[in-house]
Regions:
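Conserved donor-binding/catalytic core segment of Leloir-type glycosyltransferases
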Residues: 12, 200-228, 240
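Carbohydrate-associated surface elements
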Residues: 49, 163, 185
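Nucleotide-activated donor-binding/catalytic signature segment of Leloir-type glycosyltransferases, i.e.
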Residues: 252-270
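Short hydrophobic beta-strand element within catalytic cores of glycosyltransferases
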Residues: 307-310
Length: 448
């Protein structure tokens, strides 16, 4: 594996969302960290604690994880107390000699707080945006205001699609020249077709797979409308629905009222390692999302040999070649029409699905994603103007009231840093041995 010619960096990935929780952001951080380690970087993760996951853990692939124990809100996100993670962050930065703080997801409280503290500690900041947000309701307006304030401290941003990039620039009023587009990756060793099952597939018995969180944004309401209609049109069609969420009771009610217990199977929440086992049994993959910045699920499904029918929302249209996907409008009639046309033409489509994995493997390779991300890190390191005066000027440009409020937060943060420096000076920290990935790989080979 070729390594970067530049000095290896020490990276801290920050988010409320990380294993053992399962989701798009969690998988992204894990896979990115794994690939960065393979390329010679040192990687640590700061995440919110989850049940019994507390303190410091070293994962099998060499990722050092700090589970920060703070008060929890809904869905295991941290309660916002602004300065709650400053002390922990400073200790991590000193012990692991962090160069770059890379935070994920604008709705992560831990991420947003760490931006404030990281800049005070003199670190470079990179942000990856995983979601699209609108400008309509109060919650979206508020998060956009917060992002605009926070982004005055950010050196570079990464978006997973061009649509997501444009959305981020508009929401946060961020400098377009400091934004980068790097698509998500897929672990193609886990998502590959079953050749024997592929040979047996035909239009006589169609299984439609859909795996997502059962929530409004993921289009569960549309799915509930579409399933009974498709089952009426095609007696040979069955559905397998994976995932959990607040809309799951509505799905269960639809199955019962439409008497589809024999034709619609709900698997419930799935561990990421089990998703492929569900997908390989299907013919088509249906995505009914109302908003998506990328949609990694359709890449995973296509790589296992499924043809995709998906709503054309957000960055979905950028993800797959035309011969792998049918894009439809986000309404019941369009989705039903798309499924109908695909089923009627399935015997012709099926032959092409065997090559999907090889085509996608080159486009969405995690090592490529990591290489591109390292280039963004080096761009961030080139930002030399780190003075407090420049920082305050940027913050004041946000607006009178919000700017002054943010300046007060910054001043308090510097005072807290001064106190911590006196209370716990740098020389009081013990030197820690760095994890060496090469030695670990050698150990595993010897074990075999």
């Amino acid at each position: 594996m070729p390594k970067s010619s530049k000095k290896p960096l020490s990276i801290l990935l920050v988010s409320d969302f990380f294993y053992p929780r399962i989701g798009g952001v969690e998988v992204h951080i894990f896979q990115l960290a794994t690939s960065l380690i393979r390329l010679g970087c040192r990687v640590s993760v700061l995440a919110h604690h989850h049940k019994d996951r507390q303190g410091v853990r070293i994962m099998g692939n060499g990722i050092k994880v700090y589970f920060n124990q703070l008060i929890s809100l809904h869905d295991d996100t941290s309660y916002p107390i602004l300065y709650g993670c400053h002390k922990v962050l400073r200790e991590i930065v000193i012990k692991d000699k962090i160069d770059i703080v890379h935070f994920h997801q604008g709705t992560s409280v831990t991420s947003l707080e760490c931006v404030l503290h990281s800049r005070t500690l003199g670190l470079r900041l990179v942000y990856t945006d995983h979601s699209l947000f609108g400008f309509g309701d109060l919650a979206e307006v508020n998060i956009n205001k917060v992002l605009r304030s926070v982004f005055s401290d950010v050196d570079q941003t990464i978006s997973v699609s061009n649509i997501a990039r444009d959305n981020l620039i508009l929401r946060a009023m961020f400098n377009p020249y400091k934004t980068n587009v790097i698509p998500n990756g897929v672990d193609f060793t886990k998502f590959k077709p079953d050749k024997e099952l592929q040979k047996k597939k035909n239009s006589k018995d169609i299984t439609i797979i859909s795996v997502s969180r059962q929530a409004y944004r993921k289009g569960t309401d549309l799915l509930i409308e579409v399933i009974p209609e498709v089952c009426k049109l095609f007696p040979n069609v069955k559905f397998v629905i994976g995932g959990d969420g607040p809309k799951k009771p509505l799905l269960e009610n639809m199955i019962e009222t439409s008497n589809l217990q024999d034709r619609v199977k709900l698997t419930g929440a799935l561990h990421h390692n089990k998703v492929r086992d569900i997908m390989i049994k299907g013919n088509l993959y249906l995505n009914t999302s109302l908003t998506e910045s990328f949609c990694i699920a359709i890449v995973e499904a296509a790589s296992t040999g499924l043809y995709i029918v998906t709503t054309d929302v957000g960055g979905v249209g950028e993800v797959l070649p035309d011969n792998m996907v049918k894009l439809v409008n986000a309404d019941k009639d369009s989705i039903i029409k798309g499924i109908k046309e695909t089923i009627e033409n399935y015997d012709n489509i099926k032959d092409n699905t065997n090559d999907f994995n090889e085509v996608l493997k080159d486009a969405y390779n995690w090592d490529k994603v990591a290489h591109k991300t390292i280039k963004v890190y080096h761009k961030a390191m080139m930002n030399l103007d780190r003075s407090i005066i420049t920082r305050i000027k940027k913050v004041l440009a946000i607006g009178k009231i919000s700017g002054i409020f943010h300046v007060c937060l910054i001043i308090l943060d510097y005072l807290l840093l001064l106190f911590l420096t006196l209370y716990q000076p740098v020389k009081s920290f013990k030197k820690e041995k760095q994890f060496k990935y090469e030695n670990y790989q050698k150990y595993l080979r010897n074990m075999k």
